[in-house]
Design a protein with these regions (language model features):
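Short glycine/threonine-rich loop-to-helix capping motif typified by GTGT followed
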Residues: 71-82, 110-127, 147-154, 184-187
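Stable alpha-helical structural segments in soluble proteins, enriched in small hydrophobic residues
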Residues: 88-96, 122, 126, 155, ...
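Beta-strand segments within the central parallel beta-sheet cores of soluble alpha/beta enzyme folds
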Residues: 56-64, 101-108, 134-141, 170-179, ...
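Conserved beta-ketoacyl condensing-enzyme motif
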Residues: 1-2, 100-117
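Conserved beta-strand-centric core segments of catalytic alpha/beta enzyme folds
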Residues: 1-49, 149-228
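Short helix-capping segments at alpha-helix termini
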Residues: 54, 97-98, 127-133
Length: 228
């Protein structure tokens, strides 16, 4: 006989009277993540097979990286090792064959905790970009909360939809951006309203529990890519 139990609770405490405002990544008033639930599903196949069966192609996976920080330096069960995060991002770019200038949007891990500013700093250092040169940043967790083991799949689906439909979803509840983040990236790169944008390449990352990191580089598919 085997059994398991997980009792989730809302980790934020400042918005009990307005629960829809509790999930607020990148804000000065963030007080912890709000658990969410759901699933994301997609079909991965090579281009030749997809074309032969007439599949609707939403995006291409150019490359990516998975690593672990080993819970060293400042890494822990719940916080990533910054050195490993930066290495994961850099290696994903190399594996995908793109430069930091090619990234239009970062669909980030950002969880509405004290580590948000550290994550933004890691992106800035890994991409060697700051201020207005940082790609747009957003976090789906402001919409659906943190779906724990399912978070990466949900957020990857959102990235694919942003690419295929040409938009950047807003960061909800982001009324006052954390001052440490504004020292790294220009405020206009943290959209708080829906933006219609013709995106080409998105970097999606998850820096999850256990100090395990993943970053994937996605490209918008077009008919001109059939010979790729």
């Amino acid at each position: 006989i085997w059994g398991g139990l997980e009792a989730l609770r809302v980790c934020t405490f400042k918005h009990n009277d307005a629960s829809e405002q509790g999930a607020r990544p990148m804000t000065a008033s963030a007080s912890g993540f709000v658990p969410g639930s759901g699933a994301g599903a997609f079909v991965l196949e090579n281009l030749e097979t997809a074309l032969s069966r007439g599949a609707r192609i939403y995006a291409e996976v150019l490359g990516g990286c998975i690593n672990s920080g080993g819970q060293r330096e400042q890494g822990s069960m719940t916080a990533p090792n910054s050195s490993a995060v930066k290495s994961c991002i850099s290696k994903a770019l190399v594996e995908a064959g793109v430069n930091s200038e090619d990234i239009d949007l970062i669909n980030a891990h950002l969880t509405a905790t004290a580590m948000d500013a550290t994550e933004v700093q890691n992106w800035s250092l890994a991409l060697q970009k700051s201020g207005k040169n940082v790609p747009y940043l957003n976090s789906l967790k402001s919409h659906v909360g943190h779906a724990l083991a399912a978070a990466g799949s949900l957020e990857l689906v959102s990235s694919i939809l942003e690419l295929s439909q040409g938009f950047i979803f807003p960061n909800l509840n982001c009324d006052t951006i954390h001052p440490d983040i504004l020292e790294i990236v220009d405020e206009e790169k943290i959209p708080r309203t829906l933006l219609k944008k013709n995106l080409t390449i998105i970097a999606k990352a998850s820096f999850g529990f256990g100090d395990v990191n993943a970053c994937v580089i996605l490209k918008k598919y077009s008919d001109g890519d059939k010979s790729a």
